[in-house]
């Protein structure tokens, strides 16, 4: 049975000038926060902070959410991560995540030839092509990729991304134009083998 990952990525016109392409297009962005909703109820948030120093960009993130039903916590998730880019190329990534009672991690470094990432993760140890993107949702380049590195465990996730169209959203009496995408994992592992 395929694991279905469904995300709606919204690019509000408010951010379009700052969020327009590769990492260098994020130079004017210092802070990005989004709330996470399930069935129209806020369950958590994710915050990204951007620090620039010459040709380096460091992105730190902190996120958490809780899914409960009838007062029982079904999912309790918290994560912190740090990404370092030099000349618009990811050179380091590390994360620590607690998902219910499981501790997960990723330590990623680019190799000396800048062709591959060396990944040490809780679910994967090995190499990935340096053009593969870490699946942190601040970088809209993810919609152009056919695979991502899990920021939770380091595993390589094959994905299909479909553009569903433009939508106009009304938030606090203000209208925003958004792009709607559907992400689907095309990983054929049985659900109990996925980490």
Model-predicted segments: where are they?
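Short, intrinsically disordered, charge-balanced linker/junction segments flanking boundaries
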Residues: 189-195
């Amino acid at each position: 049975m395929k694991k279905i990952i469904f995300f709606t990525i919204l690019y509000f016109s408010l951010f379009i000038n700052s969020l327009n392409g590769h990492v260098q297009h994020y130079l004017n962005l210092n802070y990005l926060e989004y709330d996470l909703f399930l069935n129209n109820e806020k369950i958590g948030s994710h915050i990204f902070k951007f620090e620039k120093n010459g040709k380096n960009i460091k992105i730190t993130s902190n996120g958490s959410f809780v899914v409960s039903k009838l007062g029982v916590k079904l999912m309790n998730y918290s994560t912190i991560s740090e990404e370092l880019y030099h000349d618009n190329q990811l050179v380091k990534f590390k994360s620590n995540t607690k998902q219910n009672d499981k501790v997960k991690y990723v330590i990623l470094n680019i190799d000396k030839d800048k062709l591959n990432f060396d990944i040490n993760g809780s679910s994967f140890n090995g190499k990935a092509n340096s053009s593969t993107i870490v699946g942190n949702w601040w970088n809209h380049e993810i919609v152009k990729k056919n695979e991502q590195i899990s920021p939770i465990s380091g595993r390589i996730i094959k994905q299909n991304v479909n553009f569903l169209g433009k939508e106009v959203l009304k938030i606090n009496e203000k209208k925003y134009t958004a792009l709607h995408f559907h992400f689907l994992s095309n990983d054929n592992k049985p659900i109990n083998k996925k980490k």
